[in-house]
Regions:
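Hydrophobic structural segments
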Residues: 1-120
Length: 120
């Protein structure tokens, strides 16, 4: 039998802040730009460390519908390409700034950004 216990309060953070995990899909050539804007906006901070992020390559597909202005592919076609998923943590004090920075720097017309509230 596996018993689950709540971890100590200071295991993940020293301050009493709500934390989020942000995950964003980006083209291969944009990873450095997005990492930079996230860090400058206050994301990826864990204790005395900044720029704490991970990313991995995935294969993605989509079909651009009429009215779209796709970064890659053409309207009415299904596009398949390699891209990165980048993820990091951000506290509630910086969440709005980080999301705005990603949207401003991201080359996609409709950036895919997932925000998940983490358990404290």
């Amino acid at each position: 039998m596996i018993m689950m216990r709540r971890p100590p309060a200071n295991l993940f953070m020293k301050e009493d802040l709500t934390m989020y995990k942000i995950q964003v899909y980006i083209p291969l050539e944009s990873v450095d730009t997005i990492r930079e804007v996230i860090t400058k906006a206050g994301g990826g901070r864990i204790g005395n460390y900044a720029g704490c992020m991970s990313w991995w390559q995935v294969h993605s597909s989509w079909t651009s519908l009429p009215g779209a202005h796709p970064y890659d592919g053409a309207v009415g076609e299904t596009t398949e390409t390699d891209e990165y998923i980048l993820q990091c943590r951000v506290d509630d004090a910086h969440l709005s700034d980080v999301l705005a920075a990603i949207r401003e720097a991201h080359p996609y017309e409709e950036p895919v950004i997932d925000v998940v509230k983490l358990w404290k």
